[in-house]
Amino acid sequence: MSLFPADTAISPATPAALRELIESRRAVRRFTAEAVPDDVVRDCLELAVLAPNSCNLQPWSFQVIRDPALLARLHPVCMSQNAAKAPLIIAVLARPDTWKQACQNIIDYWPEPEVPARIRSFYNKTAPFQYNQGPFGLFGLFKRQLLRVAAWRKPLMRAPNSQAQMRIWAVKSTALAAQNLMLAFQSHGYATCPMEGFDEVRLRKTLNIPRQALPIMLLAVGKQDEKGVYNPRLRFPLEQHVTWL
């Protein structure tokens, strides 16, 4: 369990340094055969899980695939794309099913001698009410009907109140961790490629992924080959995506 001070100072990284790191990251399709050291992988994963996430429930998990035989089996599962020939692949999984254990973990691992009453109350009462959907999603259905009435009086959170909303909830936090992970590898000099092109059914069988886990991407990692980037970068004008209010 990693502990961090509550008053962590703002990072000394400059805007220019951050811009340089982000602009240097590209989706690389071809890698050399050079292995990624375990200490680099661990450091990057430690930075990945520092990503902001909903209620600190950290609904993610990662499978680090280094075994050459397993990587060879993954290649056709990933539509035989070149990026899937990387010397390291990390399966990034969203976990809508781990919130209950996470609530208990926060109480068990609280970094102070006494767990504040408000923390106990939130993780023993509020969070279970918020995230529990009940058998067949029936409790979620009850909450949706209850909120329709209660929300007439004041603003209320209206999600997640279904299994589908729980999946969205977990994916949002996990995507933040995945971005941390890619930038962390970039800072170590290793390129990445997030892959969505895979056969999920075969992927689950190959990696024995838990039934309720959601494979949101496979992250190829390695040293960039000479022709690793296929095309120049293209982004639409910012004005197409931003509204100032």
Task: List the model feature ranges, each with a label.
Residues 1-245:
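Acidic, surface-exposed loops and disordered segments
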